[in-house]
Amino acid sequence: MKFEMQNVYDYIDQHADEYVEFLRTLVRQPSIADTGEGIQEMVQLVKQSLQGIGARPQEIETPGNPVIYAELKGECNKTFGFYDHYDVQPVDPLNEWVTPPYSADVRDGAIYGRGVADNKNGLASKICAVDAFRKVYGKLPVNVKFIVEGEEEIGSPNLEVFAKAHPELLACDGYNWEGGVKEPGEPAQVHFGAKGLLYVELECQGPRRIRIRAMPPSLQTPPGAWCGR
């Protein structure tokens, strides 16, 4: 069967308001990995969303927050995987928010809320893309897997535990990692790596008095000077 992508794009355009509202629903649900706030409610919301596109999601327990796994069969024996996460960072400091962090407020054509950019937009876009493809053609061109974890924002401490316990679930011919970059009119960019996390606590000691006027005590250096170097 020949799949014309323009038909899928047209369907997405016709249902754009519906898909945007779905993203706003995800953003309205707190899911802070560090504190556990809203995690179980978010897990259920993601599972319901995957059920809505024809999948049978599994909630796989880990020592921390669960991993959600789902699979949909396609037309051939090739399998493509989507890695995403449903957790977000804390919302502090609250006084810097123009609108409440879970309001998913729309201003000037953009949605504002915790997690709208990292990574609930990525999760929503993939679910909506699969939904649109199935609505247009009734099937998918390849098998699709969803691996959605809930601890990415704290360094994915239990993703390796999941991977070692369920290697067969991770078997795919290719993967899409949570987000991506695509400039208008250009093909999607392929990245070969990503930065990790580094936390440093630095203590330093300098002279009590200026000994060379051209070199004042290092402790007088503004804290920002340590950043971005």
What does each model-found stretch correspond to?
Residues 189-205:
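Flexible glycine/proline-rich, aromatic-decorated loop/lid segments
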Residues 2-116, 135-142:
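Acidic/His- and Gly-rich active-site-bordering loop/insert found
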Residues 17, 44, 124, 224-228:
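A structural signal for well-ordered alpha-helical segments within the folded catalytic domains
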Residues 84-86, 108, 150-151, 178-180, ...:
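Fold-independent oxyanion-binding glycine-rich loops
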Residues 111-113, 208-214:
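Short small-residue beta-strand/loop micro-motif enriched in glycine and branched aliphatics
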Residues 167, 182-183, 192, 212-229:
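Acidic-enriched catalytic cores of C-N bond-cleaving enzymes acting on peptides and small amides
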Residues 117-193:
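Acidic/histidine-rich catalytic neighborhood of metal-dependent amide-processing enzymes
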